[in-house]
Amino acid sequence: MARYTGPKARINRRLGTMLYETAGAARAMDRRPQPPGMHTRGRRPSNYGAALMEKQKIKHYYGLGERQLRRYFENVGRKSGNTGELLLLMCERRLDNVVRRVGFTKTRPQARQGITHGHFRVNGVKVTKPGYMLRAGDLIEVRGRENLKNLYRGVIANSPPDGLDWVSFDSETLRATVLSLPGAVDISLPVDANSVVEFLSR
């Protein structure tokens, strides 16, 4: 997929939330929270425009392309339950999301880079796909090279992780264990998923 490489702060401001977590993007959002560009009197977006913005939030936050998002949508559409909630829960199970949320990295792009460079193993096997779907019982660990371990120890020391209810994390051994699948309370992105479902169903 074509990964967004432009100004992160611009996306945060346009969509009105902190989707990219770099220090520069955070400072820019604090200074100028309004959308980029010339500002006239604000107009309420149409239902289509509002749903499009919610879809864009999911794509940028989790690092998904359009086709990948639609594949996820088709997958959860075959299951029983709230489709919007199931879509977000599938995104939460991505390896790059969990690597970020347990505290191995400060941002999801950093997590994706580490995974594609082969820094992590799942159940003892090197995984290089950021979108790898984790299951209950999976063990994530940094590969045995000491320079890699020191790299991630430094990140953790500077930004202690908050912790997740569904994933245990040992900062000493650099291991994370998926205790269970995430639930609705574990979704980290505030978004109107139902409007996204309606948008993707068109």
From Swiss-Prot:
CDD domains: S4. Residues 93-155 form the S4 RNA-binding domain. GO terms for biological process: ribosomal small subunit biogenesis; translation. Pfam families: Ribosomal_S4 (PF00163), S4 (PF01479). The keyword rRNA-binding applies. Keywords: Ribonucleoprotein, Ribosomal protein, RNA-binding, rRNA-binding. Disulfide bonds: none annotated. InterPro entries: Ribosomal_uS4, Ribosomal_uS4_bac-type, Ribosomal_uS4_N, S4_RNA-bd, S4_RNA-bd_sf. GO terms for molecular function: rRNA binding; structural constituent of ribosome. GO terms for cellular component: small ribosomal subunit. Part of the 30S ribosomal subunit. Contacts protein S5. The interaction surface between S4 and S5 is involved in control of translational fidelity. Belongs to the universal ribosomal protein uS4 family. One of the primary rRNA binding proteins, it binds directly to 16S rRNA where it nucleates assembly of the body of the 30S subunit. With S5 and S12 plays an important role in translational accuracy. NCBIfam families: PRK05327.1, rpsD_bact. This is Small ribosomal subunit protein uS4. It comes from Rhodopirellula baltica (strain DSM 10527 / NCIMB 13988 / SH1).
